[in-house]
Amino acid sequence: MIQMQSILEVADNSGAKKVMCIKVLGGSHHMVAKLGDVIVVSVKDAIPGGKVKKGDVYKGVIVRTKTGVVRPDGSTIKFDQNALVLLNKQDEPIGTRVFGPVTRELRAKKYVRIMSLAEEVL
């Protein structure tokens, strides 16, 4: 579960490496974000010459969490890190590649584009 001030890795090639959550979108009492939720982030660490710069504010969709997700068959998928993919104003991915695995639950949240860019779908 991701809340305000959480530090996340960036799973795409947009140029950002680490971001910090500054707002969880989705209602006034939405305090934590889970897999597939959209959050507002600030870039804390970026590579030189990338598409994004340190201090920029973007939206992002969470693709991996340490707490994981429980599927209807009872199985649980957990990851070693919290990661997200940065989105532009039109809610499309900024990067052209997604590194690492993503889960099938993104399809239910209408992020098929991220699934097609990912290396592996679990």
Swiss-Prot record:
Gene3D superfamilies: Ribosomal protein L14. GO terms for cellular component: cytosolic large ribosomal subunit. GO terms for biological process: translation. InterPro entries: Ribosomal_uL14, Ribosomal_uL14_bac-type, Ribosomal_uL14_CS, Ribosomal_uL14_sf. SUPFAM superfamilies: Ribosomal protein L14 (SSF50193). Keywords: Ribonucleoprotein, Ribosomal protein, RNA-binding, rRNA-binding. One of its GO terms (molecular function) is structural constituent of ribosome. Belongs to the universal ribosomal protein uL14 family. Binds to 23S rRNA. Forms part of two intersubunit bridges in the 70S ribosome. Part of the 50S ribosomal subunit. Forms a cluster with proteins L3 and L19. In the 70S ribosome, L14 and L19 interact and together make contacts with the 16S rRNA in bridges B5 and B8. This is Large ribosomal subunit protein uL14. It comes from Rickettsia africae (strain ESF-5). The gene is rplN.
